[in-house]
């Protein structure tokens, strides 16, 4: 687990595995079962976004460490969104094998489960940092970070995810990409 993952988990109104959150649209505690995911995600993907995001990363290898420079640029194409907008920079890792508790299985433990897109941590904290207030069409922001890479994470299997949300947690747009492509 991670601090960020624990925060997201504790926001749920009901906790069980597997379970998913999709955009915190109505309430941050809303949850959906796997059978609901596909149709709800399809609906969300049809929503127009007022914000375009770009991520650029540079990896700097030192003898004893790796530094990651992260640059996120956002541009608004609508004035229909207001309030404080927060940028969260999250890291996920895929192809991890381990024990997964799944109440729908018998036995409930799947010991050789392959985890993909497992939340590992963040640059900004789970809820992010305010990057712009009351944006108008044409407004932009740029945020730059340097991160000392956690050597326990396989960088070749990791993604960086930029999430911009409003002050209620509703996700305005997000973008993810592998750190090494």
Where are these regions (language model features)?
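Short, conserved sequence motifs used for protein processing/export or organelle targeting and
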Residues: 1-181
């Amino acid at each position: 687990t991670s601090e960020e993952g624990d925060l997201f988990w504790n926001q749920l109104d009901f906790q069980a595995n597997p379970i998913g959150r999709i955009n915190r649209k109505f309430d941050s505690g809303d949850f959906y079962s796997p059978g609901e995911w596909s149709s709800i995600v399809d609906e969300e993907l049809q929503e127009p976004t007022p914000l375009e995001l770009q991520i650029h990363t540079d990896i700097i290898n030192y003898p004893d460490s790796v530094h990651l420079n992260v640059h996120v640029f956002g541009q608004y194409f609508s004035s229909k969104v207001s309030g404080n907008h927060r940028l969260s920079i999250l890291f996920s890792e895929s192809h991890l094998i381990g024990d997964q508790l799944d109440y729908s299985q018998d036995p409930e433990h799947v010991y050789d489960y392959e985890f993909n897109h497992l939340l590992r941590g963040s640059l900004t904290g789970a809820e992010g940092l305010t990057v712009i207030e009351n944006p108008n069409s044409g407004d932009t922001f740029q945020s730059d970070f340097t991160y000392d890479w956690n050597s326990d994470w396989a960088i070749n299997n990791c993604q960086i995810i930029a999430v911009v949300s409003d002050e209620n947690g509703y996700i305005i747009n997000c973008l993810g990409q592998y750190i090494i492509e």
